[in-house]
Amino acid sequence: MSIKSDKWIRRMAEEHKMIEPFVPDQVRASEDGRRIVSYGTSSYGYDIRCADEFKIFTNINSTIVDPKNFDEGSFVDFKGDVCIIPPNSFALARTVEYFRIPRTVLTVCLGKSTYARCGIIVNVTPFEPEWEGYVTLEFSNTTPLPAKIYANEGVAQVLFFESDEVCDVSYADRGGKYQGQRGVTLPKT
């Protein structure tokens, strides 16, 4: 299994719509020249952006967090350019980009150091072979202070690994529960 380069990422995005919308280069400034958290194609990965729709976790109901029976009422929906995550809490969001992962590919997604150095951890599980959809992102604020997440800017980097052989059963073959997800998606069992 080998990591794929910027050339491969560009080719797969342009010829097979692996990433939509696709940015072929690294963007480091907004159209008005303001510095932003970078996004787009890098040497051996693709820096994804966070869309402007968020679910911010609050514990107003003193709920027990149960991944098998998650209380949707524990979230406040928010739409905007900047999301404030409460201290020691988390928020969910989705990517701007829609992904279509080839059958021979598995991805690993890592948070950007800009956020990590501020105590904001980005968690995303691997994109499995033949999975497609918008990626649900989880942001943990590990600090005792409120923390900002910026919509439409880079939040994490996706690394693409291609196997030497095709898997017997892909995510699509087994009817994965998050296949084709469109918005911020809560836990499913």
From Swiss-Prot:
State its Enzyme Commission number(s).
3.5.4.13
What keywords tag this UniProt record?
Answer: Hydrolase, Nucleotide metabolism, Nucleotide-binding
In terms of InterPro entries, this protein maps to: dCTP_deaminase (IPR011962), dUTPase-like_sf (IPR036157), dUTPase_trimeric (IPR033704)
Q: Which BP terms does GO give this entry?
A: dUMP biosynthetic process; dUTP biosynthetic process; nucleobase-containing small molecule interconversion
- In this protein, the active site sits at E138 (proton donor/acceptor)
Residues recorded as binding dCTP, renumbered to this chain, are K112, S113, T114, Y115, A116, R117, T136, L137, E138, Q157, Y171, Q181
What disulfide bonds does the UniProt entry report for this chain?
A: none
Cross-referenced Pfam families: DCD (PF22769)
Q: Decide whether keyword Protein biosynthesis is in the record.
A: no
Which catalysed reactions does the entry list for this protein? dCTP + H2O + H(+) = dUTP + NH4(+)
Q: Would I find DNA damage among this entry's keywords?
A: no
Judged by the first EC level, this protein's enzyme class is hydrolase
Which molecular-function annotation in GO is an example for this chain?
Answer: nucleotide binding
User: What CDD domains does the record point to?
Assistant: trimeric_dUTPase
Please give the pathway this protein is involved in: Pyrimidine metabolism; dUMP biosynthesis; dUMP from dCTP (dUTP route): step 1/2
**What family is this?**
Belongs to the dCTP deaminase family.
Listed under subunit, the entry gives: Homotrimer.
Q: What does this protein do?
A: Catalyzes the deamination of dCTP to dUTP.
Annotated protein name in UniProt: dCTP deaminase
